[in-house]
């Protein structure tokens, strides 16, 4: 035989990977496999070992092969690879590399090595649940080959596999395998040898030969080795017959008249059967087929293809001999509309069953059942439950299918209700987040949470709170000369900057009334830098005034007052509640603002004491006269006075840098836990 790998140069391209990739045909890794229960997934894995072994399984088999046959082929160790090689590349095709290495190493022995590799593949990897999956296919080799044909056909249909790979059990001891990869065909030869020994304790010779006219098809012919003289070709020991009762061992008659059932009873028992002769002419119909087609046969003949469409197996040639070769494959037959028939009730009905060769009459017997999924499919095809034999499991399939459909309908309704509830919950959660966010904009976080939960909020005293009051100099005059829209637009631009300062310095905006803007620090998160934050904000507010003008082009001028002291804070009102500050310190802070001047920051003695605990704040050289102190401010001995805050310089920075740079760096430092 010519080299098994001979092919044209253009066919030496890399073949598609045989790895079970995520989302691919096999996708076995994603399923949870039971250690005990045999499932369809295990059958998939078992047959994949024959048709598309994984890189891991191949590497295991190669390792064993190298250990056993290193002396026979010194260079065989080159086939072995580090597992990381193909683990790092999901699409790596190990089998293609094995094929190329064998062609370079020893072309004459390439097929022999591949057969041995197939045997090692079964020996090393066919264990546990995979071995059980192979054993469930049949009690002997012939049954195994026949089941391999039928099971693989079903698996391909379920996985929507459009490749040409497949098995055909063409007769006793004959298997035809289709594959575009010759290397798989030779690997399968060794795998079948090892499986025969493992499962049925039989040594067989398997001859492989190409099928004439199709380079992708290979025929495997099984023959028994001489040492197994006590064993039949297909694995059944001849000694078993000794245990069978003598009455059962009687040879069956091939005379139809000796059958214990007449044709009428057979047609009644199996309504969905037919028998056809070598010319594929119908010679007998079951009661179900007879009811549908008998009126038309007198006019249109008895040719089977007139009434039946053979849908599966795929690629079946409508010749008697070819059908006989596919008797191990499930058949799916569709019912045709008879010529001239009007309103044929069973058009499109499919019958699934088995084709049996009857050598005594050289005919073919088909026995099947309607391929239905529910009562609707039954009635739509003009059938009744009575048309399904009592022994046929299709009855249970139809009735159980209806029950499952009702359960699915209930499940879908429940899922729809569940989705509606989840959508409603999601909408409620979304609205809740909006409301909570809005409350956090108006109130301190602790107060906002209590308001949302509906908890009672008691007024609370806070010590060392630094309060800022500000207003616009000449605001009444500005309002008298401008329209309300102009005034609102001016305040909107100015207060937008101030609100950003509140977020940056983490201070609480108490309220705005007209041109008055009030903030406080030390309410929601007390810190030794509360006075510093308010002072820095005051400096940035004065700086921001230079960037805003009135309607007539004049610069906005503000005056600001700062004071630090104890305040009482609480929520007032139920409709549109407000978080208000009360106490002597609030009044004094407002007085310091009234006693300030345009573009000046009037600082109380208590606030100055807090600011001077750290370097950087600059005040006017000459303190103000004590008479400028508010009358409400306690000043025993008349030694205290107020001060104008002029600027701030971070000692660690160049003094020539802008004021904003000094403030931003200092704020960043204390935010990170450092010392301003």
From Swiss-Prot:
Domain (Guanylate cyclase): residue spans on this chain: 466-593
Signal peptide positions on this chain: none
SUPFAM superfamilies: Ligand-binding domain in the NO signalling and Golgi transport, Nucleotide cyclase
Enzyme kind, highest EC tier: lyase
EC number of the protein: 4.6.1.2
Tissue occurrence: Head, where it is preferentially expressed in the CNS and the retina. Not found in bodies.
Gene Ontology terms for molecular function: GTP binding; guanylate cyclase activity; heme binding
SMART domains: CYCc (SM00044)
GO biological process entries: cGMP-mediated signaling; G protein-coupled opsin signaling pathway; positive phototaxis; response to oxygen levels; visual perception
Subcellular location: Cytoplasm
Catalytic activity, reaction form: GTP = 3',5'-cyclic GMP + diphosphate
Keywords (A to Z) from UniProt: cGMP biosynthesis, Cytoplasm, GTP-binding, Lyase, Nucleotide-binding, Sensory transduction, Vision
Cellular component GO terms, alphabetical: guanylate cyclase complex, soluble
Complex formation: Heterodimer.
Function in brief: May have a role in phototransduction. Catalyzes the conversion of GTP to cGMP, a common second messenger that is utilized in a wide variety of cells and signal transduction pathways. A second subunit is required for enzyme activity.
Family: Belongs to the adenylyl cyclase class-4/guanylyl cyclase family.
Name this protein carries in UniProt: Head-specific guanylate cyclase
């Amino acid at each position: 035989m010519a080299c098994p790998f001979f092919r044209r140069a253009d066919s030496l391209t890399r073949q598609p990977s045989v790895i079970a990739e995520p989302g691919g045909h096999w996708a076995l890794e994603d399923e949870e496999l039971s250690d005990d229960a045999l499932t369809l997934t295990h059958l998939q894995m078992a047959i994949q070992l024959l048709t598309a072994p994984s890189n891991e399984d191949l590497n295991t088999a190669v390792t064993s092969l190298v250990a056993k046959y290193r002396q026979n082929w010194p260079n065989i160790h080159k086939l072995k690879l580090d597992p990381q090689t193909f683990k790092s590349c999901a699409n790596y095709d190990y089998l293609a590399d094995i094929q190329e290495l064998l062609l370079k190493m020893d072309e004459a022995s390439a097929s022999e090595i591949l057969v041995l590799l197939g045997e090692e593949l079964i020996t090393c990897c066919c264990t546990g649940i995979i071995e059980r999956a192979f054993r469930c296919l049949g009690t002997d080799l012939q049954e195994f080959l026949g089941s391999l044909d039928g099971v693989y056909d079903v698996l391909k249909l379920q996985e929507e596999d459009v490749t040409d790979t497949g098995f055909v059990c063409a007769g006793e001891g004959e298997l035809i395998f289709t594959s575009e990869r010759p290397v798989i065909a030779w690997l399968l030869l060794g795998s079948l040898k090892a499986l025969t020994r493992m499962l049925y304790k039989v040594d067989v010779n398997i001859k492989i030969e190409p099928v004439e006219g199709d380079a992708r098809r290979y025929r495997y012919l099984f023959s028994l080795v001489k040492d197994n003289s006590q064993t039949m070709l297909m694995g059944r020991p001849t000694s078993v017959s000794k245990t069978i009762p003598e009455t059962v061992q009687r040879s069956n008659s091939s005379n139809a008249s000796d059958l214990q059932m007449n044709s009428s009873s057979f047609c009644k028992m199996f309504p969905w059967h037919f028998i056809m002769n070598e010319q594929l002419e119908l010679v007998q119909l079951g009661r179900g087929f007879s009811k549908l087609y008998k009126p038309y046969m007198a006019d249109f003949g008895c040719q089977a293809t007139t009434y039946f469409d053979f849908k599966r197996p795929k690629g079946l040639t409508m010749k008697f001999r070819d059908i006989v070769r596919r008797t191990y494959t499930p058949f799916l037959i569709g019912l045709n509309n008879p010529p001239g028939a009007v309103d044929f009730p069973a058009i499109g009905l499919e019958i699934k069953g088995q084709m049996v060769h009857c050598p005594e009459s050289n005919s073919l017997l088909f026995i099947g059942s309607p391929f239905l999924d529910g009562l609707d499919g039954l009635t739509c095809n003009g059938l009744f439950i009575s048309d399904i034999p009592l022994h046929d499991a299709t009855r249970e399939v139809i009735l159980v299918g209806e029950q499952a459909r009702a359960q699915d309908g209930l499940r879908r309704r429940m899922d729809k209700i569940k989705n509606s509830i989840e959508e409603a919950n999601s909408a409620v959660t979304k609205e809740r987040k909006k409301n909570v966010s809005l409350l956090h904009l108006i109130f301190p976080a602790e107060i906002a949470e209590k308001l949302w939960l509906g908890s009672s909020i008691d007024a609370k005293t806070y010590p060392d709170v630094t309060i800022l009051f500000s207003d616009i100099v000449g605001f009444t005059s500005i309002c008298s000369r401008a329209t309300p829209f102009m005034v609102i637009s001016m305040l909107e631009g100015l207060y937008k900057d101030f609100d950003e300062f509140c977020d940056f310095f983490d201070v609480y905006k108490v309220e705005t009334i007209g041109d008055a803007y009030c903030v406080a620090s030390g309410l929601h998160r007390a810190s030794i830098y509360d006075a510093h934050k308010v002072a820095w904000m005051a400096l940035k507010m004065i700086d921001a005034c230079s960037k805003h003008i009135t309607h007539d082009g004049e610069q906005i001028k503000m005056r600001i007052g700062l004071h630090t002291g104890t305040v009482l804070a609480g929520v007032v009102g139920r409709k549109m509640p407000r978080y208000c500050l009360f106490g002597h310190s609030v009044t004094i802070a407002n007085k310091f603002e009234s006693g300030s001047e345009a573009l000046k920051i009037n600082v109380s003695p208590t606030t100055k004491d807090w600011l001077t605990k750290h370097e950087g704040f600059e005040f006017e050289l000459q303190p103000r006269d004590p008479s400028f102190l508010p009358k409400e401010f306690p000043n025993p001995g008349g030694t205290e006075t107020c001060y104008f805050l002029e600027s701030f310089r971070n000692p660690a920075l160049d003094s020539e840098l802008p004021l904003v740079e000094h403030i931003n760096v200092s704020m960043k430092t204390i935010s990170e836990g450092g010392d301003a």
